[in-house]
């Protein structure tokens, strides 16, 4: 910048001796025609050369800086390709680089200003005759150009500082992300190790559970087999008991069928007994003298009574067996008939005992009541 300023300062110094030239021109009007035209042209040409050299030097420096920036950008791009997860941050940096491209476009606009300046120089060469009036305008324009170049250089310094700061921030962010990624990878490795250990534990526990379940199933099968064997034995016993009960039922039915004719015989003998009792009552008065015969007859009657009692006991046993087997209503009818038979037997016993005591009259009255029944 100091060299640019030193190159820009000779401009007004070259223009300073012009008043002397004016005075000389006034003194020597003949020499003004050649020397007066040569000095402004050389000064302006030197100024234009100095400005072009300064601009070329600035552009060269900026091109070197931009080459460095491009190298750094390429390095950043290679690093960003390794970290695909940081595309968002790279997009931010690319947006910042686009802003730098805008600044480059502004620099190109400054170059277009240089072309305009050259056009102005050519116009100045045409208007050398009017240079006396346009010196102030030229100095003002030079000052404006110096200010513009100063502003451009300051802007480039700021942009370079911002880019350096951005690269430093990006490096720090890359380091942070790299550390975070490494931490995540380490945590993932630890989780994978813990999961593998858990899987091993689960496999061992499943094997143990399978063994225990197989043992329990075998024990359950043995228990079921034992229960089945015991159940089969119980079923066999029940079948045997059923067969015995069926045989007993057949025996009881046979006995019942064998006792039925005896009962019929008893029923058949009951009217004869009743007739005999009536005949005894009728001839009781005639038979008082024949007590021996009556005693014999009573003995026979007692024997017959014993037989009847035996028959009654057998009938009672049959009744008990019939109640256990629970036959139909025919058995109930037979029970009723047996009850009537028992009543008649008891009446006969009472009659025989009354006859012995000499109470035949009372017994006859009672017998009439039973006949009415």
Curated annotation (Swiss-Prot):
Taxonomy, superkingdom: Eukaryota
Q: Where do glycans attach? A: 151
Q: What is this protein called?
A: Inhibitor of nuclear factor kappa-B kinase-interacting protein
Post-translational modification, as annotated:
N-glycosylated at Asn-151.
Q: Which InterPro entries match?
A: Inh_kappa-B_kinase-int
Per the UniProt entry, what are the Gene Ontology biological process annotations, in alphabetical order?
A: response to interleukin-1; response to lipopolysaccharide; response to tumor necrosis factor
Where in the cell does this protein reside?
Endoplasmic reticulum membrane
What's this protein's function? Target of p53/TP53 with pro-apoptotic function.
UniProt xrefs under PANTHER family: INHIBITOR OF NUCLEAR FACTOR KAPPA-B KINASE-INTERACTING PROTEIN (PTHR21734:SF11)
Q: What sections of the sequence does the record tag as coiled-coil?
A: 86-257, 285-324
Alphabetical GO CC annotations of the entry are: endoplasmic reticulum; endoplasmic reticulum membrane
Q: Where is the composition biased (Basic residues)?
A: 1-11
Which keywords describe this protein according to UniProt?
Coiled coil, Endoplasmic reticulum, Glycoprotein, Membrane, Transmembrane, Transmembrane helix
Report if keyword Membrane is assigned.
yes
Q: Basic and acidic residues bias located where? A: 18-33
Q: What membrane topology does the UniProt entry give?
A: Single-pass membrane protein
Give the start-end ranges of region Disordered.
1-38
Gene name, Swiss-Prot/TrEMBL: Ikbip
- Quote additional remarks: Shares a common promoter with APAF1 from which the 2 genes are transcribed in opposite directions.
Residue spans crossing the bilayer: 43-59
């Amino acid at each position: 910048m100091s060299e640019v300023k030193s190159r820009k300062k000779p401009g007004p110094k070259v223009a300073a001796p012009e008043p002397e030239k004016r005075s000389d021109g006034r003194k020597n009007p003949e020499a003004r025609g050649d020397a007066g035209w040569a000095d402004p042209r050389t000064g302006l040409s030197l100024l234009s050369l100095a400005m072009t050299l300064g601009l070329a030097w600035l552009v060269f420096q900026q091109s070197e800086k931009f080459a460095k920036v491009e190298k750094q950008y390429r390095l950043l791009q290679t690093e960003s390709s390794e970290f695909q997860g940081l595309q968002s941050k790279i997009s931010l940096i690319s947006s910042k680089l686009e802003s730098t491209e805008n600044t480059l476009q502004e620099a190109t606009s400054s170059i277009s200003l240089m072309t305009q300046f050259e056009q102005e120089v050519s116009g100045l060469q045409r208007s050398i005759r009017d240079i006396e009036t346009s010196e102030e305008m030229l100095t003002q324009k030079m000052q404006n150009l110096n200010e513009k170049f100063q502003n451009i250089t300051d802007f480039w310094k700021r942009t370079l500082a911002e880019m350096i700061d951005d690269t430093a921030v990006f490096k720090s962010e890359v380091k942070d992300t790299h550390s975070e990624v490494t931490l995540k990878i380490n945590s993932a490795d630890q989780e994978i190790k813990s999961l593998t250990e858990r899987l091993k534990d689960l496999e061992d526990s499943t094997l143990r559970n399978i063994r225990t379940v197989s043992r329990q199933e075998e024990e359950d099968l043995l228990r079921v087999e034992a229960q089945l064997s015991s159940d089969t034995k119980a079923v066999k016993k029940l079948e045997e008991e059923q067969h015995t009960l069926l045989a007993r039922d057949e025996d009881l039915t046979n006995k019942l069928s064998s006792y039925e004719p005896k009962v019929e015989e008893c029923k058949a003998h009951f009217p004869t007994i009743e007739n005999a009792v009536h005949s005894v009552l009728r001839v009781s008065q005639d038979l008082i003298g024949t007590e021996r015969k009556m005693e014999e007859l009573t003995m026979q009657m007692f024997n017959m009574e014993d037989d009847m009692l035996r028959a009654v006991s057998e009938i009672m046993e049959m009744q008990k067996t019939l109640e256990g087997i629970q036959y139909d209503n025919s058995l109930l009818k037979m029970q009723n008939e047996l009850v009537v038979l028992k009543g008649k037997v008891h009446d006969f016993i009472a009659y025989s005992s009354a006859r012995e005591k000499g109470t035949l009259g009372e017994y006859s009255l009672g017998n009439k009541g039973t006949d009415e029944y």
